[in-house]
Swiss-Prot record:
This is Bifunctional protein HldE. Residues 1-318 are annotated as: Ribokinase. InterPro entries: Bifunc_HldE, Carboh/pur_kinase_PfkB_CS, Cyt_trans-like, PfkB_dom, RfaE_dom_I, RfaE_dom_II, Ribokinase-like, Rossmann-like_a/b/a_fold. The gene is hldE. It holds the Pfam family PfkB. One of its GO terms (molecular function) is heptose 7-phosphate kinase activity. Its EC number is 2.7.1.167, 2.7.7.70. Transmembrane segments: none annotated. It comes from Proteus mirabilis (strain HI4320). The lineage of its organism: Bacteria, Pseudomonadati, Pseudomonadota, Gammaproteobacteria, Enterobacterales. It catalyses: D-glycero-beta-D-manno-heptose 7-phosphate + ATP = D-glycero-beta-D-manno-heptose 1,7-bisphosphate + ADP + H(+); D-glycero-beta-D-manno-heptose 1-phosphate + ATP + H(+) = ADP-D-glycero-beta-D-manno-heptose + diphosphate. Gene3D superfamilies: 3.40.1190.20, HUPs.
Amino acid sequence: MKVTLPDFNKANVLVVGDVMLDRYWYGPTSRISPEAPVPVVKVDTIEERPGGAANVAMNIASLGANSRLVGLTGIDEAAKALSNTLSQVNVRCDFVSIATHPTITKLRVLSRNQQLIRLDFEEGFSNVSPEPIYERIQQALPSMGALILSDYAKGALSHVQQMIQLAKKAGVPVLIDPKGSDFERYRGATLLTPNMSEFEQVVGVCHTDDELVEKGTQLVKDLALDALLITRSERGMSLLQANEAPLHLPTQAQEVYDVTGAGDTVIGVLATALAAGKPLAEACFLANAAAGVVVGKLGTSTVSPIELENAIRGRADNGFGIMEESQLKQAVALARQRGERIVMTNGCFDILHAGHVSYLANARKLGDRLIVAVNSDASTKRLKGESRPVNPLEQRMTVLGALGAVDWVVAFEEDTPQRLIASVLPDILVKGGDYKPEDIAGSKEVWAAGGEVKVLNFEDGISTTNIINAIKKK
C-alpha cells in the first residue's frame, strides 16, 4: 500500500467526550517521612497535560488540522489550566461548565522515573443534562469532516446513542473509542476502536487470528457498524469490515516507553485522515504509524506531521530525509527536545565520492543528527562555472539522503548557507578542507549562540574536479 500524508490543514474534526487534566509532579526523594513509612518527594517540576478527550483533540491539532472540543468541566482552576493549555496548541474549546462538579483531574507524583502515587479528583457527570452538549454538536457538525466520541465512562457520553444519530443525520462519520463491555450503546457508529482487552470483554477470548476475525466481523454486523479497528499492542492493529478482507497492520513501534494516551493518538489520526479525504485503509495505516511514534514518548503525547512522515516511509524511503527549511526547523526542534546535538555541514556534492562519504561519516560522529545543506543548481553554477552541476539538485539530494550518516538534507539558493545556518543554529558547524574557522559561512552566528565550529580534513587526491577530468580523458 502506497501511503502519503493528506493535507491535514483542510481537515475539521469535532471531539466530544470526557475531558480531564493530567498533572505530573516530579522530584527527587532521599528519605522516608517521620510521619509515616512513605518517601518524601521534593517537588521541583510540575507539568500539566490535557488528558482523555482533550488529548485526542490535541493530537488532531498537532497534525495541523482544525480541532474543536466539547466536554464537561467544573468552574475551577483546573478548567482554566486545561483551556489555556489547549488554546496554546490551537484547540477550540467549547466546554459546558458545571458549578457543582470539579474538573476531572489526575495527579501523578513521580521520582526517578517511578510513579509513586496517583490522586484522582472527580465526581463524574452522569447526572448532568446532555442538552447543552447536543446543542454544541448540532451547531458544529455542518462544518465537520468527522466526529470522535471519546468515552472514558465519566458521564459526558451517557447519552451516546443520541449523539450518534445527530452525526448520521448530518452525514458525518462518527468514530468511537469505547469503554466497558456494553458495545450495544454504540450501535450504528461508523467505527469503533477497542483495544484487545476491551474487545475480548465483549466477544470472549480469541485464541487465533481467524477467531478474532470471525468474532469481530460478526460484531460489525450485529451492531450495524461500518468497521471495527482493534488495537492489539505489540501485534499491531486489525481492521475488520463486514464485506471486506481483514487488514492486519503490524506494530511500527521501535521502543516502547509509555502506552499512556496511545489510543487517543490512534483515533485522532484516524479521524483526521478520514476528514482530509483518505480512504479507511490508508487512514488506519497512518494511525498505526502514529501509535508507533507516540509509545516511544513518556506520558500522554502527540505526533507531528514530520514524525508521521518519517514513520510511514521509514529511514530508507522517506524522501531520504529531504526537507524544506520550515520542516527542517521543526525536526531540529523535536530533536533538541530529545536532547540530541545537531551537526551541520554544506557543499555542492556534485558527484558524490569516497572522500565525501568519509567526511560526512566523520561529521556525523560529532553529534547525534547531521544536516547537509546543498547548493541549488543556480548557486552551484555561480560557484563552479557554467558546466556545473553535473547532477541536478534533486539527484544530489537523493544520493546524500541515502547515506546512513545523513539525517536531513536541505537546499539553499544563496551563494553561501549563512542565512540558513543562522536560522537553524546547529550545535556544531562543520566544514571540510583547509578553512580557518572564522572564515566559514555562519561561524559567527553559531559561536554567538554558544555552538562550535570545526574543520575536518578531506581525503587527499579525491575530488569532483579530478573525477570529471578523468572522465573527459577517456
